[in-house]
Amino acid sequence: MDLAFPHVCLWTLLAFVLTWTVFYVNNRRKKVAKLPDAATEVRRDGDADVIIVGAGVGGSALAYALAKDGRRVHVIERDMREPVRMMGEFMQPGGRLLLSKLGLEDCLEGIDEQIATGLAVYKDGQKALVSFPEDNDFPYEPTGRAFYNGRFVQRLRQKASSLPTVQLEEGTVKSLIEEKGVIKGVTYKNSAGEETTAFAPLTVVCDGCYSNLRRSVNDNNAEVISYQVGYVSKNCQLEDPEKLKLIMSKPSFTMLYQISSTDVRCVMEIFPGNIPSISNGEMAVYLKNTMAPQVPPELRKIFLKGIDEGAQIKAMPTKRMEATLSEKQGVIVLGDAFNMRHPAIASGMMVVLSDILILRRLLQPLRNLSDANKVSEVIKSFYVIRKPMSATVNTLGNAFSQVLIASTDEAKEAMRQGCFDYLSSGGFRTSGMMALLGGMNPRPLSLIFHLCGITLSSIGQLLSPFPSPLGIWHSLRLFGAEGVSQMLSPAYAAAYRKSYMTATAL
């Protein structure tokens, strides 16, 4: 009797503990199921899979690509009218290849687009005709296209909105909706002026070089390095219209190219602090008196035609901005809102199309995008894989623009002449440089090889007809400016290959 009572108490206590444990665990599981982690998006009926802010080249192309993969895409664009821009008017051969991989090659048709087979380069009375190479390794027609940017953008918008899972809406995005470091959607004002919200597991900021949302995602700032001043000369056609005319003028380059069967774009670079006023007519006088005399005689009439006929002259800032990865989840930045380089080689659209192809392929294995952690891993991979294309184009664009700047410095002017000589020399040097400029061979090592070649050609200018102390000094300065240790040392070369060449380019 005395032993029975303690046994009963022990068994009763054990039963109570087991019952309480089971009850607690079950309740805990229910709470976890009801209260998901902040990184997991709670889907609402009718929500899109992806919100894209901006329906320019990048936003429209991305919307089409993701919708073809079965994603529901909500695109919010500030102004659905046809854009009027003087940038984004040339698609390199490499860009056309990427456009075709996205199934959008027909958007460059039926807009009075002009075939471009290469460049006509002018310097101090010299002229060189250089073409994009017929390269068996490049699986597409080796020609570019010049066009009105607005016509191209409208075709892309039409193509994207033709898919049933794309909602293309006019509205102004005011801010991103953020919870615990995860972007959940956007607040925007629709075309009726009503402020509303939209939610999606992934938000893509693709609102261009004047992005208002970029600072909400990262602290990247764009640097204004110069201004592109341009206008259109109408009802005229260039001699040999399939060649873009690149003039090594002062203070920097001038370009003329056919953007329709009847219209020619004239554009030149001017640096801050020396920009005449457009509104009071000073710019028109500057173009006629200072720039026109530097334009070759066979092009000068067309250059002056637009000015004499009162064409609208525009000035647009040239910006440079390195790409940085945001620490916030549920969001990615693309296009000029993400990364900008000098437009001298007209490759901005090519870079964003490459980025879209990479991002699309990385997202394809994810059945849904609700897990912000998984999407963040995709974005990190995207940032690495894009390097072969973006690093090559960014470096080339910025380096080429520096070479085109006129200077009284003997070393810099030798580099300018060396670039002209290298481009016009023919053979593998010309074909290699044109393949790089055309996005047909976006390999960093090839870029290093040809930049070294231009540098050596420039040094030859300085040391000709025989070495002098001053020439040798300028040569050493030139090598130092180009970073000889980074280019030639085995350690730097190995690090470069590891960083850029191990990733698979699309």
Curated annotation (Swiss-Prot):
FAD binds at V57, G58, E77, R78, R85, F90, R157, V173, D336, M349. It is found in: Membrane. The keyword Glycosyltransferase does not apply. Catalyzes the stereospecific oxidation of squalene to (S)-2,3-epoxysqualene, and is considered to be a rate-limiting enzyme in steroid biosynthesis. Belongs to the squalene monooxygenase family. Pathway: Terpene metabolism; lanosterol biosynthesis; lanosterol from farnesyl diphosphate: step 2/3. It is a multi-pass membrane protein. Its EC number is 1.14.14.17. Keywords: FAD, Flavoprotein, Membrane, Oxidoreductase, Transmembrane, Transmembrane helix. It comes from the Eukaryota. It catalyses: squalene + reduced [NADPH--hemoprotein reductase] + O2 = (S)-2,3-epoxysqualene + oxidized [NADPH--hemoprotein reductase] + H2O + H(+). This is Squalene monooxygenase 1,1. InterPro entries: FAD-dep_OxRdtase, FAD/NAD-bd_sf, Squalene_epoxidase, Squalene_monox. One of its GO terms (biological process) is sterol biosynthetic process. GO terms for cellular component: membrane. Its cofactor is FAD. The keyword Oxidoreductase applies. Pfam families: DAO (PF01266), SE (PF08491). GO terms for molecular function: flavin adenine dinucleotide binding; squalene monooxygenase activity. The chain crosses the membrane at residues 3-23, 47-67, 447-467. Signal peptide: none annotated.
